[in-house]
Protein backbone atom coordinates (compact mmCIF):
# COMPACT_ATOMS: atom_id res chain seq x y z
CA UNK A 1 0.00 0.00 0.00
CA UNK A 2 1.56 3.26 -1.07
CA UNK A 3 1.42 6.24 1.27
CA UNK A 4 -0.66 8.20 -1.19
CA UNK A 5 -3.35 5.52 -0.94
CA UNK A 6 -3.49 5.51 2.86
CA UNK A 7 -6.64 6.54 4.69
CA UNK A 8 -6.11 7.35 8.35
CA UNK A 9 -8.98 6.22 10.55
CA UNK A 10 -9.71 6.17 14.26
CA UNK A 11 -10.90 3.08 16.09
CA UNK A 12 -14.15 4.19 17.72
CA UNK A 13 -15.20 0.86 19.26
CA UNK A 14 -13.79 -2.59 19.99
CA UNK A 15 -16.08 -5.51 20.90
CA UNK A 16 -15.14 -9.03 21.98
CA UNK A 17 -17.47 -11.36 20.07
CA UNK A 18 -15.96 -14.76 20.87
CA UNK A 19 -12.88 -15.99 22.76
CA UNK A 20 -10.90 -15.47 19.54
CA UNK A 21 -12.72 -12.75 17.55
CA UNK A 22 -12.97 -9.01 18.09
CA UNK A 23 -14.95 -6.49 16.04
CA UNK A 24 -13.38 -3.09 15.32
CA UNK A 25 -15.38 -0.04 14.21
CA UNK A 26 -13.41 2.54 12.21
CA UNK A 27 -14.24 6.12 11.22
CA UNK A 28 -12.54 9.15 9.75
CA UNK A 29 -11.37 11.66 12.39
CA UNK A 30 -13.68 14.36 10.99
CA UNK A 31 -16.69 12.04 10.72
CA UNK A 32 -16.89 12.33 6.92
CA UNK A 33 -18.10 9.35 4.87
CA UNK A 34 -15.52 6.72 4.00
CA UNK A 35 -15.09 5.53 0.38
CA UNK A 36 -17.96 3.43 -0.98
CA UNK A 37 -17.63 -0.34 -1.24
CA UNK A 38 -19.65 -3.39 -2.21
CA UNK A 39 -20.30 -6.62 -0.33
CA UNK A 40 -17.27 -8.91 -0.32
CA UNK A 41 -14.75 -6.05 -0.26
CA UNK A 42 -11.74 -5.89 2.04
CA UNK A 43 -9.31 -3.24 3.21
CA UNK A 44 -5.61 -3.53 3.92
CA UNK A 45 -4.89 -2.43 7.49
CA UNK A 46 -1.38 -1.19 8.32
CA UNK A 47 -0.21 -1.28 11.94
CA UNK A 48 3.04 0.06 13.33
CA UNK A 49 4.56 -1.81 16.25
CA UNK A 50 7.72 0.07 17.12
CA UNK A 51 9.91 -0.08 14.03
CA UNK A 52 7.98 -3.01 12.60
CA UNK A 53 4.95 -2.72 10.32
CA UNK A 54 2.19 -5.29 9.94
CA UNK A 55 -0.15 -5.30 6.93
CA UNK A 56 -3.27 -7.47 7.03
CA UNK A 57 -6.32 -7.65 4.77
CA UNK A 58 -9.72 -7.79 6.49
CA UNK A 59 -13.19 -8.06 4.99
CA UNK A 60 -15.57 -5.17 5.53
CA UNK A 61 -18.58 -6.57 7.36
CA UNK A 62 -20.66 -3.43 7.83
CA UNK A 63 -23.42 -2.33 5.46
CA UNK A 64 -22.29 -0.84 2.14
CA UNK A 65 -25.30 1.48 2.45
CA UNK A 66 -23.73 3.31 5.42
CA UNK A 67 -20.13 4.41 5.00
CA UNK A 68 -19.95 6.68 8.04
CA UNK A 69 -18.08 3.79 9.61
CA UNK A 70 -16.34 0.59 8.53
CA UNK A 71 -16.38 -2.57 10.61
CA UNK A 72 -13.89 -5.43 10.47
CA UNK A 73 -13.52 -8.58 12.56
CA UNK A 74 -10.16 -10.02 13.53
CA UNK A 75 -9.60 -13.59 14.66
CA UNK A 76 -6.51 -14.09 16.76
CA UNK A 77 -4.45 -16.73 15.00
CA UNK A 78 -2.20 -19.07 16.94
CA UNK A 79 0.38 -18.86 14.15
CA UNK A 80 -0.01 -15.09 13.78
CA UNK A 81 2.80 -13.28 11.96
CA UNK A 82 1.99 -10.33 14.20
CA UNK A 83 -1.02 -8.57 12.71
CA UNK A 84 -3.88 -10.34 14.46
CA UNK A 85 -2.00 -10.47 17.76
CA UNK A 86 -1.25 -6.74 17.49
CA UNK A 87 -4.91 -5.92 16.81
CA UNK A 88 -6.05 -7.95 19.82
CA UNK A 89 -3.38 -6.75 22.25
CA UNK A 90 -2.64 -3.15 21.29
CA UNK A 91 -5.57 -1.67 19.35
CA UNK A 92 -8.31 0.02 21.40
CA UNK A 93 -10.80 2.84 21.04
CA UNK A 94 -8.81 5.92 20.11
CA UNK A 95 -6.07 4.09 18.20
CA UNK A 96 -5.32 5.53 14.78
CA UNK A 97 -4.72 3.10 11.91
CA UNK A 98 -3.87 3.42 8.23
CA UNK A 99 -6.06 1.54 5.78
CA UNK A 100 -6.17 1.23 2.01
CA UNK A 101 -9.16 1.92 -0.20
CA UNK A 102 -11.65 -0.97 -0.39
CA UNK A 103 -10.93 -3.63 -3.00
CA UNK A 104 -13.32 -6.42 -3.96
CA UNK A 105 -12.10 -9.83 -5.10
CA UNK A 106 -15.26 -11.62 -3.94
CA UNK A 107 -18.20 -9.90 -5.61
CA UNK A 108 -21.51 -11.55 -6.42
CA UNK A 109 -21.65 -12.90 -9.96
CA UNK A 110 -23.43 -10.49 -12.23
CA UNK A 111 -26.62 -11.59 -13.98
CA UNK A 112 -27.12 -14.43 -11.47
CA UNK A 113 -30.20 -14.53 -9.25
CA UNK A 114 -29.53 -17.30 -6.70
CA UNK A 115 -26.44 -16.97 -4.50
CA UNK A 116 -25.55 -19.55 -1.84
CA UNK A 117 -22.96 -18.67 0.81
CA UNK A 118 -20.97 -21.33 2.69
CA UNK A 119 -18.96 -19.98 5.63
CA UNK A 120 -16.64 -21.62 8.13
CA UNK A 121 -15.60 -19.77 11.30
CA UNK A 122 -14.21 -16.29 10.61
CA UNK A 123 -15.07 -16.88 6.95
CA UNK A 124 -18.50 -15.48 7.77
CA UNK A 125 -17.24 -11.90 7.51
CA UNK A 126 -17.47 -11.14 3.76
CA UNK A 127 -21.00 -12.52 3.65
CA UNK A 128 -22.26 -10.11 6.31
CA UNK A 129 -21.82 -7.14 3.97
CA UNK A 130 -23.27 -9.15 1.07
CA UNK A 131 -26.41 -9.81 3.11
CA UNK A 132 -26.65 -6.20 4.27
CA UNK A 133 -26.31 -4.93 0.72
CA UNK A 134 -29.29 -6.85 -0.68
CA UNK A 135 -32.74 -6.73 0.90
CA UNK A 136 -34.94 -9.86 0.83
CA UNK A 137 -37.38 -9.94 -2.05
CA UNK A 138 -35.08 -8.00 -4.36
CA UNK A 139 -33.41 -8.96 -7.61
CA UNK A 140 -31.22 -11.60 -5.97
CA UNK A 141 -31.89 -14.52 -3.63
CA UNK A 142 -29.36 -15.10 -0.86
CA UNK A 143 -28.91 -18.18 1.30
CA UNK A 144 -26.29 -18.67 4.04
CA UNK A 145 -24.87 -21.88 5.50
CA UNK A 146 -22.58 -21.11 8.46
CA UNK A 147 -20.54 -23.80 10.23
CA UNK A 148 -18.55 -23.16 13.40
CA UNK A 149 -16.87 -25.08 16.20
CA UNK A 150 -19.10 -24.50 19.25
CA UNK A 151 -21.78 -22.06 20.48
CA UNK A 152 -19.24 -19.70 22.08
CA UNK A 153 -17.38 -19.46 18.74
CA UNK A 154 -20.44 -18.53 16.69
CA UNK A 155 -19.73 -14.87 15.94
CA UNK A 156 -22.66 -12.85 14.56
CA UNK A 157 -25.17 -15.70 14.95
CA UNK A 158 -27.62 -13.66 17.03
CA UNK A 159 -27.46 -10.77 14.56
CA UNK A 160 -28.00 -13.08 11.60
CA UNK A 161 -30.98 -14.83 13.18
CA UNK A 162 -32.55 -11.48 14.05
CA UNK A 163 -31.80 -9.94 10.66
CA UNK A 164 -33.91 -9.59 7.51
CA UNK A 165 -32.41 -12.74 5.94
CA UNK A 166 -33.04 -14.93 9.01
CA UNK A 167 -35.33 -17.33 7.13
CA UNK A 168 -32.45 -18.21 4.80
CA UNK A 169 -29.72 -18.51 7.46
CA UNK A 170 -28.69 -22.05 8.42
CA UNK A 171 -26.13 -22.75 11.16
CA UNK A 172 -24.17 -25.91 11.98
CA UNK A 173 -22.44 -26.32 15.36
CA UNK A 174 -19.74 -29.00 15.34
CA UNK A 175 -19.75 -29.57 19.12
CA UNK A 176 -23.49 -30.30 18.97
CA UNK A 177 -23.03 -32.93 16.29
CA UNK A 178 -24.49 -30.74 13.55
CA UNK A 179 -22.88 -31.29 10.15
CA UNK A 180 -23.18 -29.38 6.91
CA UNK A 181 -23.87 -32.06 4.28
CA UNK A 182 -22.39 -30.45 1.18
CA UNK A 183 -23.49 -33.18 -1.21
CA UNK A 184 -27.06 -32.91 -0.03
CA UNK A 185 -26.93 -29.13 -0.29
CA UNK A 186 -25.66 -29.15 -3.86
CA UNK A 187 -28.39 -31.60 -4.88
CA UNK A 188 -31.06 -29.15 -3.69
CA UNK A 189 -29.73 -26.17 -5.65
CA UNK A 190 -31.02 -25.02 -9.02
CA UNK A 191 -28.60 -25.49 -11.90
CA UNK A 192 -28.03 -21.76 -12.31
CA UNK A 193 -27.12 -21.04 -8.66
CA UNK A 194 -23.73 -19.58 -7.79
CA UNK A 195 -21.95 -20.91 -4.71
CA UNK A 196 -19.47 -18.92 -2.60
CA UNK A 197 -17.25 -20.44 0.08
CA UNK A 198 -15.04 -18.71 2.63
CA UNK A 199 -13.30 -20.46 5.49
CA UNK A 200 -10.48 -22.88 6.23
CA UNK A 201 -8.75 -24.62 3.32
CA UNK A 202 -10.43 -27.91 4.23
CA UNK A 203 -13.89 -26.40 3.77
CA UNK A 204 -12.94 -24.83 0.46
CA UNK A 205 -11.53 -28.13 -0.78
CA UNK A 206 -14.63 -30.04 0.31
CA UNK A 207 -16.96 -27.64 -1.50
CA UNK A 208 -15.02 -27.94 -4.74
CA UNK A 209 -14.71 -31.73 -4.42
CA UNK A 210 -18.45 -32.24 -3.90
CA UNK A 211 -19.25 -29.85 -6.73
CA UNK A 212 -16.92 -31.75 -9.06
CA UNK A 213 -18.60 -35.07 -8.24
CA UNK A 214 -21.90 -33.58 -9.40
CA UNK A 215 -20.42 -31.92 -12.47
CA UNK A 216 -21.03 -28.44 -11.10
CA UNK A 217 -19.48 -25.80 -13.41
CA UNK A 218 -16.37 -24.19 -11.92
CA UNK A 219 -17.58 -20.87 -13.29
CA UNK A 220 -20.37 -21.01 -10.69
CA UNK A 221 -18.02 -21.61 -7.76
CA UNK A 222 -16.28 -18.75 -5.96
CA UNK A 223 -13.92 -18.91 -2.99
CA UNK A 224 -11.99 -16.80 -0.55
CA UNK A 225 -9.75 -18.46 1.99
CA UNK A 226 -9.48 -17.29 5.60
CA UNK A 227 -6.45 -19.17 6.80
CA UNK A 228 -2.93 -17.92 7.15
CA UNK A 229 -0.62 -19.37 4.51
CA UNK A 230 2.61 -20.81 5.89
CA UNK A 231 5.20 -18.38 4.55
CA UNK A 232 8.17 -19.43 6.69
CA UNK A 233 11.19 -21.30 5.39
CA UNK A 234 14.94 -21.11 5.08
CA UNK A 235 16.56 -17.74 4.48
CA UNK A 236 17.65 -16.72 0.98
CA UNK A 237 18.78 -13.74 -1.07
CA UNK A 238 16.47 -11.82 -3.39
CA UNK A 239 17.86 -9.45 -6.02
CA UNK A 240 15.71 -6.63 -7.40
CA UNK A 241 17.24 -6.40 -10.87
CA UNK A 242 15.86 -3.05 -12.03
CA UNK A 243 16.32 -1.40 -8.63
CA UNK A 244 19.86 -2.70 -8.19
CA UNK A 245 19.07 -3.88 -4.66
CA UNK A 246 20.07 -7.16 -2.99
CA UNK A 247 18.20 -8.22 0.15
CA UNK A 248 18.36 -11.05 2.64
CA UNK A 249 14.97 -12.65 3.32
CA UNK A 250 14.99 -14.18 6.84
CA UNK A 251 13.25 -17.43 7.73
CA UNK A 252 10.17 -15.73 9.18
CA UNK A 253 9.84 -12.87 6.66
CA UNK A 254 8.14 -12.80 3.27
CA UNK A 255 9.78 -11.35 0.17
CA UNK A 256 7.14 -8.61 0.15
CA UNK A 257 7.91 -7.67 3.76
CA UNK A 258 11.65 -7.59 3.08
CA UNK A 259 11.14 -5.34 0.06
CA UNK A 260 8.85 -2.99 1.99
CA UNK A 261 11.29 -2.75 4.89
CA UNK A 262 13.96 -1.72 2.38
CA UNK A 263 11.76 1.22 1.39
CA UNK A 264 10.82 -0.08 -2.06
CA UNK A 265 7.23 0.68 -3.05
CA UNK A 266 5.26 -2.19 -4.55
CA UNK A 267 1.52 -2.65 -5.06
CA UNK A 268 -0.20 -5.34 -3.01
CA UNK A 269 -3.75 -6.10 -1.93
CA UNK A 270 -4.69 -9.39 -0.30
CA UNK A 271 -1.24 -10.40 1.02
CA UNK A 272 -2.48 -14.00 1.11
CA UNK A 273 -1.50 -15.22 -2.37
CA UNK A 274 -4.97 -14.84 -3.83
CA UNK A 275 -5.31 -11.69 -5.92
CA UNK A 276 -2.11 -11.63 -8.01
CA UNK A 277 -1.39 -7.93 -7.46
CA UNK A 278 2.20 -8.54 -6.29
CA UNK A 279 3.08 -10.95 -9.11
CA UNK A 280 6.48 -10.24 -10.70
CA UNK A 281 8.68 -11.99 -13.25
CA UNK A 282 11.46 -14.37 -12.21
CA UNK A 283 14.74 -13.67 -14.01
CA UNK A 284 16.96 -16.19 -12.23
CA UNK A 285 16.44 -18.88 -9.62
CA UNK A 286 13.48 -21.04 -8.68
CA UNK A 287 10.39 -20.17 -6.65
CA UNK A 288 8.71 -22.19 -3.92
CA UNK A 289 5.13 -21.34 -4.91
CA UNK A 290 2.64 -21.16 -2.03
CA UNK A 291 -0.10 -19.04 -3.60
CA UNK A 292 -3.63 -19.85 -4.72
CA UNK A 293 -3.46 -17.59 -7.77
CA UNK A 294 -1.18 -19.36 -10.26
CA UNK A 295 -2.34 -22.67 -11.71
CA UNK A 296 -0.17 -25.80 -11.67
CA UNK A 297 1.23 -25.18 -15.17
CA UNK A 298 2.14 -21.58 -14.32
CA UNK A 299 3.88 -22.68 -11.14
CA UNK A 300 5.83 -25.35 -13.00
CA UNK A 301 6.90 -22.82 -15.65
CA UNK A 302 8.71 -20.74 -13.00
CA UNK A 303 8.09 -17.52 -14.93
CA UNK A 304 6.52 -15.42 -12.15
CA UNK A 305 6.19 -15.36 -8.36
CA UNK A 306 3.74 -13.84 -5.87
CA UNK A 307 5.89 -11.98 -3.39
CA UNK A 308 3.41 -11.98 -0.50
CA UNK A 309 3.54 -15.71 0.28
CA UNK A 310 5.98 -17.58 -1.96
CA UNK A 311 9.67 -18.12 -1.24
CA UNK A 312 12.78 -19.29 -3.10
CA UNK A 313 13.91 -22.88 -3.54
CA UNK A 314 17.34 -21.67 -4.62
CA UNK A 315 19.73 -19.68 -2.39
CA UNK A 316 19.38 -16.69 -4.72
CA UNK A 317 16.34 -15.37 -6.55
CA UNK A 318 16.48 -12.54 -9.10
CA UNK A 319 13.20 -10.78 -9.91
CA UNK A 320 12.14 -8.06 -12.34
CA UNK A 321 11.60 -5.20 -9.92
List the model feature ranges, each with a label:
Residues 48, 102-103, 283:
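Short, surface-exposed secondary-structure boundary micro-motifs
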Residues 260-262, 267, 276-321:
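Iron-sulfur (Fe-S) cluster-binding segments and ferredoxin-like electron-carrier domains
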Residues 39-41, 230-237, 274-276:
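A short, compositionally biased
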Residues 85-241, 248:
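FNR/FR-type flavoprotein reductase catalytic core
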Residues 236-267:
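C-terminal accessory/binding modules appended to enzymatic or scaffolding proteins
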Residues 2-96, 113, 148-151, 159-161:
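Ferredoxin-reductase
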Amino acid sequence: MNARESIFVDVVAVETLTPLIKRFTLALPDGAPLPPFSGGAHVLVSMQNGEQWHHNAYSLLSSPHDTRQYQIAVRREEASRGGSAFMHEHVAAGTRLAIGSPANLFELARNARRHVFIAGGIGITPFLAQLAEHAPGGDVELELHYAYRSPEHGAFVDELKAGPHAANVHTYVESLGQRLDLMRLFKTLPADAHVYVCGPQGLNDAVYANAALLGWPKSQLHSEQFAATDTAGRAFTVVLARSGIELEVPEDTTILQAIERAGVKIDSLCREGVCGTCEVAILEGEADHRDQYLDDDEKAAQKTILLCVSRARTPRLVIDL
